[in-house]
């Protein structure tokens, strides 16, 4: 899954470059043998929102769905200037399975699968309240700590994964502002930063 994210970071960068860094910190305390894996992946260029809103090559069907979603939020007065703006909504929508800004690309699931893998390693908050992941793009910040997870939705004969950060599991409902928010800081591109606690049962030695 990390490989998929690296590919995505390079493909979706308007400068066609991505950068990554990681390190592992082994910990032996209180009779417990654990480790902390730190990972940062980033690219520079257009933000996720800009890749959809200011990109003539972006699939029209996807952009139309995003605009329709914005209209629903506007009609219900769910946007708040400086707190939760259209940019943040579109960035969250872009994480959903099947959504991509690249024409004729069928994947559109690398990010959501990476998020699911993160949660699979992390486990519940009761077991691991250390692991965290953060995505920042443009003026949007999204925090993953396990409070909200990936959900499976069914439409007709199709199944797909969604991450809505609310109790309803509906992207049309405003996400929890503690985890999805508009910030004062602008990052020209996208950063994914993760801190993952690894226990001995998370890693199997191959002899």
Task: Give names to the regions the model predicted.
Residues 42-48:
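Glycine-rich acidic phosphate-binding loop
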Residues 3, 25, 44, 138-140:
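An acidic- and aromatic-residue-enriched active-site/binding cleft used to recognize and process polar
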Residues 1-32, 111-121:
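Conserved ATP-binding N-box helix of the HATPase_c
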Residues 7, 43, 96-98:
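Residue-level signal for functionally critical sites in structured catalytic/ligand-binding pockets
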Residues 34-39, 190:
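Short beta-strand element(s) in the Bergerat
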Residues 50-207:
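Flexible, glycine-/charge-rich segments associated with ATP-binding catalytic modules
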Residues 28-35, 125-129:
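Short, solvent-exposed loop/turn segments that connect beta-strands within catalytic domains
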